[in-house]
């Protein structure tokens, strides 16, 4: 199979998809909802729960309303992309697999300065944390490596390995440009470059105005409360997947309220706690749902061990 042209943003994504598909990952499509990071995708957050084997890779558009800069900052956007890889259980050679992906992109670890800098990760809203590293390529952070220890307040057993590529940053390095907007997204049939700015600059300008000045605060507070109530109701109904969608909607409403500066510092902590409580309830409900199914994707010995432990705890 020929390798995509990694000198374009489009080709870079295709090359990462190709590489991780060859490593046996389920290549998924982006989640069709607003999330702040690829970790929120059910393929990471929910699949990290329980003993079942899971390997996947996907691009995830990520929205962080407070990071908008009206299209004026060459390195900071309120909408950008992550390439997410989830390997469960985390393989012993995960670091070698990652370095292999860089080679596939034309970045030779023998030539370039690649450093793993300890940087443990935490998501207060998801009740998740892990041991990890930032990966620096010639002095610029391009990837976050995390070994999940806990998700939704539940211990990760086995541990899930997560690799999150900052694909705009890698593309800026490969294309040797100083502004995200100057990245070549692809080349038109007539040879004209289509840039990242052609695709997204207007969106950054307008969405920054929306996030900071026009998002309806009353509607967002109401949305948060409604999604919170819906999530709780769905958990009671034994439906963790739609309940989790409500968690993501509530989280995005919170992020927009944060951008509108509608939440005080003390209120902010209270909102984070409300989302975390929902996420924990979803995590437990998802574990229980998979337990009821007998953890069909888990190796037999591990499945039996976790089921026996869950049954013993249930009898206490």
From Swiss-Prot:
Question: What keywords would UniProt list here?
Answer: Aminoacyl-tRNA synthetase, ATP-binding, Cytoplasm, Ligase, Nucleotide-binding, Protein biosynthesis
Family matches, as Pfam families? tRNA-synt_2e (PF02091)
Localization annotation = Cytoplasm
Species of provenance: Teredinibacter turnerae (strain ATCC 39867 / T7901)
Taxonomy, superkingdom: Bacteria
The molecular function terms of the Gene Ontology recorded here are: ATP binding; glycine-tRNA ligase activity
Q: Which terms does the UniProt entry file under GO BP?
A: glycyl-tRNA aminoacylation
Protein name as annotated: Glycine--tRNA ligase alpha subunit
């Amino acid at each position: 199979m020929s390798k995509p042209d990694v000198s374009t943003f489009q080709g870079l994504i295709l090359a990462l998809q190709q590489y991780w598909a060859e490593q046996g990952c389920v290549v998924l499509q982006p989640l069709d909802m607003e999330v702040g990071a690829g970790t929120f995708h059910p393929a990471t957050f929910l699949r990290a729960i329980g003993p079942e084997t899971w390997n996947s890779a996907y691009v995830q558009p990520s929205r962080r309303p407070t990071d908008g800069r009206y299209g004026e900052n060459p390195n900071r956007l309120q909408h950008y992309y992550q390439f997410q890889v989830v390997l469960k259980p985390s393989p012993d050679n995960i670091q070698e697999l990652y370095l292999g992906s860089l080679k596939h992109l034309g970045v030779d670890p023998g030539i370039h300065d690649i450093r793993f800098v300890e940087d443990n990760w935490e998501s207060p809203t998801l009740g998740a944390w892990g041991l990890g590293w930032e990966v620096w390529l010639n002095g610029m952070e391009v990837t976050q490596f995390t070994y999940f220890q806990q998700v939704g307040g539940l211990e990760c057993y086995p541990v899930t390995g997560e690799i999150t590529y900052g694909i705009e940053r890698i593309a800026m390095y490969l294309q040797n440009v100083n502004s995200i907007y100057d990245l070549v997204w692809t080349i038109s049939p007539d040879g004209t470059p289509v840039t990242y700015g052609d695709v997204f600059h207007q969106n950054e300008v307008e969405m920054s105005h929306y996030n900071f000045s026009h998002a309806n605060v009353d509607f967002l507070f109401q949305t948060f409360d409604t999604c919170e109530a819906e999530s709780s109701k769905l958990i009671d109904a034994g439906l963790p997947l739609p309940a989790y969608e409500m968690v993501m909607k509530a989280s995005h409403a919170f992020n927009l309220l944060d951008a509108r500066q509608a939440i005080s510092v003390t209120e902010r902590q209270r909102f984070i706690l409300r989302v975390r409580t929902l996420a924990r309830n979803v995590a437990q409900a998802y574990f229980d749902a998979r337990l009821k199914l007998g953890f069909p994707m888990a190796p037999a010995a591990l499945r039996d061990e976790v089921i026996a432990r869950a049954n013993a705890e249930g009898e206490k």
